[in-house]
Amino acid sequence: MEDIKIKEIFENIYEVDLGDGLKRIATKSIVKGKKVYDEKIIKIGDEEYRIWNPNKSKLAAAIIKGLKVMPIKRDSKILYLGASAGTTPSHVADIADKGIVYAIEYAPRIMRELLDACAERENIIPILGDANKPQEYANIVEKVDVIYEDVAQPNQAEILIKNAKWFLKKGGYGMIAIKARSIDVTKDPKEIFKEQKEILEAGGFKIVDEVDIEPFEKDHVMFVGIWEGK
């Protein structure tokens, strides 16, 4: 264990050096002794750190690719759109260990996997719902500090704006993984990213960071914006 070096780069997010030259990040697990997927766990003293795989998480990929603005903090309230099986939400819950994660997933079959991932993470509230219809979960979700979206729909940017109008505090942050191929397979991805950025800005976001997450995901960009409201 002597050759393991660990350094906090954002709140509750750590850069891990195992001495092999590879760039790795990890979150400090809030549920010790439990894996959510096949992540490697490193024990240092009384703490357990879960290696965060950038091939399975667009947020991890963005951090490794140089994300500068990371709005998710220890006490953040987060609305997570497109929670899937819970891989990234479980790490987000580790980061926001004093906060809460409202995890929205549309597919009932995947929801079962999400429930398993959330079982012992008391700060995740899994919700079966359609991110296109925020009014359907408005009785559960409170005002939040951050909305994170990973939804492969042609109207991805509009979904973020719609949910921001319902739930995002003014001055809060939106984070969105834009997948060019979900919007238009015939267009140049760079043109799509430019258009989506303009939609987000026209909808009320001031974009403060953007990261291309290749080689982990092809034709994906992570945008981070401050909600100024419309």
From Swiss-Prot:
<dbReference type="InterPro" id="IPR020813">
    <property type="entry name" value="Fibrillarin_CS"/>
</dbReference>
<dbReference type="Pfam" id="PF01269">
    <property type="entry name" value="Fibrillarin"/>
</dbReference>
<dbReference type="GO" id="GO:1990259">
    <property type="term" value="F:histone H2AQ104 methyltransferase activity"/>
</dbReference>
<feature type="binding site">
    <location>
        <begin position="105"/>
        <end position="106"/>
    </location>
    <ligand>
        <name>S-adenosyl-L-methionine</name>
    </ligand>
</feature>
<dbReference type="GO" id="GO:0000494">
    <property type="term" value="P:box C/D sno(s)RNA 3'-end processing"/>
</dbReference>
<dbReference type="GO" id="GO:0003723">
    <property type="term" value="F:RNA binding"/>
</dbReference>
<dbReference type="InterPro" id="IPR000692">
    <property type="entry name" value="Fibrillarin"/>
</dbReference>
<comment type="function">
    <text>Involved in pre-rRNA and tRNA processing. Utilizes the methyl donor S-adenosyl-L-methionine to catalyze the site-specific 2'-hydroxyl methylation of ribose moieties in rRNA and tRNA. Site specificity is provided by a guide RNA that base pairs with the substrate. Methylation occurs at a characteristic distance from the sequence involved in base pairing with the guide RNA.</text>
</comment>
<keyword id="KW-0698">rRNA processing</keyword>
<keyword id="KW-0808">Transferase</keyword>
<keyword id="KW-0819">tRNA processing</keyword>
<comment type="similarity">
    <text>Belongs to the methyltransferase superfamily. Fibrillarin family.</text>
</comment>
<dbReference type="GO" id="GO:0008649">
    <property type="term" value="F:rRNA methyltransferase activity"/>
</dbReference>
<feature type="binding site">
    <location>
        <begin position="87"/>
        <end position="88"/>
    </location>
    <ligand>
        <name>S-adenosyl-L-methionine</name>
    </ligand>
</feature>
<feature type="binding site">
    <location>
        <begin position="130"/>
        <end position="131"/>
    </location>
    <ligand>
        <name>S-adenosyl-L-methionine</name>
    </ligand>
</feature>
<feature type="binding site">
    <location>
        <begin position="150"/>
        <end position="153"/>
    </location>
    <ligand>
        <name>S-adenosyl-L-methionine</name>
    </ligand>
</feature>
<protein>
    <recommendedName>
        <fullName>Fibrillarin-like rRNA/tRNA 2'-O-methyltransferase</fullName>
        <ecNumber>2.1.1.-</ecNumber>
    </recommendedName>
</protein>
<dbReference type="GO" id="GO:0008033">
    <property type="term" value="P:tRNA processing"/>
</dbReference>
<dbReference type="InterPro" id="IPR029063">
    <property type="entry name" value="SAM-dependent_MTases_sf"/>
</dbReference>
<keyword id="KW-0694">RNA-binding</keyword>
<dbReference type="GO" id="GO:0031167">
    <property type="term" value="P:rRNA methylation"/>
</dbReference>
<comment type="subunit">
    <text>Interacts with nop5. Component of box C/D small ribonucleoprotein (sRNP) particles that contain rpl7ae, FlpA and nop5, plus a guide RNA.</text>
</comment>
<keyword id="KW-0489">Methyltransferase</keyword>
